[in-house]
Amino acid sequence: MRKIRKSIVTLYPFNLFKFTDMKKRIIQFLTTYFLFVLLFALQKPIFMVYYRELYINASLGDYFRVMWHGLPLDLSLAGYLTAIPGLLLIASAWTDSSVLRRIRQVYFGLIAFIMACIFIVDLGLYGFWGFRLDATPIFYFFSSPKDAMASVSFWFVLLGIVAMLIYAGILYCIFYYVLIREKNPMKIPYRRQNVSLALLLLTAALFIPIRGGFTVSTMNLSKVYFSSDQLMNHAAINPAFSFMYSATHQNNFEKQYRFMDPNTADKLFAKMVDKPATPADSIPQLLNTQRPNIVFIILESFSTHLMETFGGQPNVAVNMDKFAKEGILFSNFYANSFRTDRGLASIISGYPGQPSTSIMKYPEKTDKLPSIPRSLKNAGYNLEYYYGGDADFTNMRSYLVSSGIGKIICDKDFPLSERTGKWGAQDHVLFQRLLKDMKEEKQQEPFLKLVQTSSSHEPFEVPFHRLDDKVLNAFAYADSCVGDFIKQYQELPQWKNTVFVLVPDHQGAYPYPIENPLDGQTIPLILIGGAIKEPRVIDTYASQIDIAATLLSQLGLPHDEFTFSKDILNPSSPHFGYFTRPNYFGMVTPENQLVYNLDANTVQLDEGTEKGANLEKGKAFLQKLYDDLAKR
């Protein structure tokens, strides 16, 4: 009998628990994997406790449900992180060199640091952006580190760095005492081929959780969506996986958001583009001249919630409320995205914001975008851009120059004594400079001036103290700067031939949080000036991308190259508001207000008399946007 058992052991090399050195390595492998899973799982309740105001109604069971449903991403990322330790364990079966131990120490030290950075950055940014970490901050930081950090205070950054170091230290201590320190060092096994083969199979098996199983779909964020409450779904997301997934899906635009076959998308999209006016004179004229001077005032983070006109906060944007009555108000207007770089492209080029990237990242693509400035330059307009901050932030300068703007006034054009804001020159300084230039310089008319404000942005530190609420006070300050400028400009002879386009770059900061995603995109669009025929309210549904076609149509200029822009005043064109964020798109018409979650691939909100009417149209619109992005 002993001979038979000995023969079985000899013939069966995978009798794993017969060999101490093999057992040690397998236990080490499994410990490494499940330790990563445990650490990722514990991050979720920490996130929820940190944002306890958002999760105030969450029960203890909700915490466990979030951890349970978040496991697929945790298991997947743990698989990625265990692969290298698995290979090192295989190597340890062939050599006991101290080099392997040093590699393990460096590897786990690096992983501890990366995990800490991602978790703390995600923890800090979620309160500002409302979605888990993706690759977006990398673009903002490297385009202008100063501006990327301007939204937060020095102490916020310092505390974040300290938290990263402490968390990284805690993680490394855990890794050291559980994985790195060897009380009984593993020896080179007698049957090293068998040990290596067993560990190789285990390492290869990591492909299963990494991929998410054997089904057709691979691991993605939708795997952890389980609740109708988006806050619960957000808590279940592993921020490190979200960041990695976003970073590796930045450029393959032609493969992203494939909802339907190309022919179906083409047919649906053809019904959503601008149409020839029928009859030709059916478009009402808003201006009393065809070549007015045009001043765009792009308001940082403004929204309808700040205006009493829309039922928002009274006594905040008092000048905007005044202009809404004196000028032309578009009352059902939407921001196309959630950040300045996406908002600028929507306003200036009629190009919708993208959920997974920003076209501003790719100067070779923005070079090929149509733009209002270029169209007006060809019509004889003089172009200038004014901004109190860094014009290089998010590649804005390259975009503006490629749009035909020759004169760019930015932070470097103001003396240091006037750059007192976190973002550079405060708004009142910006408008004083603009007014001074307009008075002193011999203005070549007609002109287009793009003015971008910055003070109504985190950290909301402004030289103005009318309201107790810091955030509302910053918006009231920006509003007062616009009001004072327009009041003084009215005294200039250019007033009678000028139209001001007042539009936010996106909505943000107030109120917070916003539960309904539709409420997070509503912004005002107001036209005012001496070139306006008469005040009126236009209730057509539209968004920032429609400004280009509408304005150029009023000037009698072609706008065919603005593929996604529609004339808001054209009764023959389809009208809708469209917007995207990193995890959803929305399409809004009087009949249907729809939001589709791109992570979960499910309808998040569906209201109106014709529920679901905008679902396929919204998908086709996004698919065609990415087709266009891939070609540029």
Language-model region placement:
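N-terminal, intrinsically disordered charge-dense segments
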Residues: 2-4
